[in-house]
């Protein structure tokens, strides 16, 4: 069994930039140990005759032919803008020059 120390939890939380209070460090250490035990069980499973897959159910794209259609959606959307300039949205400046 892999033992996760409190120092390990602190190190991982620092690398992940997560703030963990001292009162939760031991809890997370125990939870990480349980996760690693579960992974160790999964590693023991014989998967030699199981083909690799990316999903449990095969997904098939249903393709359709593109149809060009005239629309005035752009104007309708622009009419909803609180502030616009011609055919463009006008947004507040967020970056300094």
Swiss-Prot record:
Catalytic activity: L-glutamyl-tRNA(Gln) + L-glutamine + ATP + H2O = L-glutaminyl-tRNA(Gln) + L-glutamate + ADP + phosphate + H(+); L-aspartyl-tRNA(Asn) + L-glutamine + ATP + H2O = L-asparaginyl-tRNA(Asn) + L-glutamate + ADP + phosphate + 2 H(+)
UniProt cross-references to Pfam families, sorted A to Z: GatC
Gene Ontology MF annotations: asparaginyl-tRNA synthase (glutamine-hydrolyzing) activity; ATP binding; glutaminyl-tRNA synthase (glutamine-hydrolyzing) activity
Entry's EC annotation: 6.3.5.-
Catalytic EC class: ligase
GO biological process assignments: glutaminyl-tRNAGln biosynthesis via transamidation; regulation of translational fidelity; translation
UniProt-listed SUPFAM superfamilies: Glu-tRNAGln amidotransferase C subunit
Superkingdom classification of source: Bacteria
Key words, A-Z: ATP-binding, Ligase, Nucleotide-binding, Protein biosynthesis
Transmembrane segments: none
Protein role: Allows the formation of correctly charged Asn-tRNA(Asn) or Gln-tRNA(Gln) through the transamidation of misacylated Asp-tRNA(Asn) or Glu-tRNA(Gln) in organisms which lack either or both of asparaginyl-tRNA or glutaminyl-tRNA synthetases. The reaction takes place in the presence of glutamine and ATP through an activated phospho-Asp-tRNA(Asn) or phospho-Glu-tRNA(Gln).
Family according to the record: Belongs to the GatC family.
Assembly behavior: Heterotrimer of A, B and C subunits.
The protein's name: Aspartyl/glutamyl-tRNA(Asn/Gln) amidotransferase subunit C
Organism (species): Prochlorococcus marinus (strain SARG / CCMP1375 / SS120)
High-level lineage: Bacteria, Bacillati, Cyanobacteriota, Cyanophyceae, Synechococcales
